[in-house]
Amino acid sequence: MGKNNDWLNFEHLVKDKQIEALQPPSMYKVILNNDDYTPMEFVIDVLQKFFSYDIERATQLMLNVHYQGKAICGVFTAEVAETKVAHVNQYARENEHPLLCTLEKA
């Protein structure tokens, strides 16, 4: 019997959808930017509180912010990165510091 129903073959469509579904999400770098007013201790506190760094790593990153102007705190999916940026910026404002946290595509 011949294949008269070839037009019903949706296998190629399913494979395309599976490939789309398996693509990893876009990732974003969360960055702390230096300013002349935020105390170093506060930057360390932020790195420990919001990014779960131990004191040694938080201190290293704080020094990168201080001497290089910025430091990458981590790379996350868009939703996680946006949430971390919002929380850090809100926490800085609540504590009356101009510390700025931003994100950029990784």
Swiss-Prot record:
GO terms for biological process: protein catabolic process; proteolysis. Gene3D superfamilies: 3.30.1390.10. Coiled coil: none annotated. Disulfide bonds: none annotated. InterPro entries: ClpS, ClpS_core, Ribosomal_bL12_C/ClpS-like. Pfam families: ClpS. Involved in the modulation of the specificity of the ClpAP-mediated ATP-dependent protein degradation. Binds to the N-terminal domain of the chaperone ClpA. Belongs to the ClpS family. This is ATP-dependent Clp protease adapter protein ClpS.
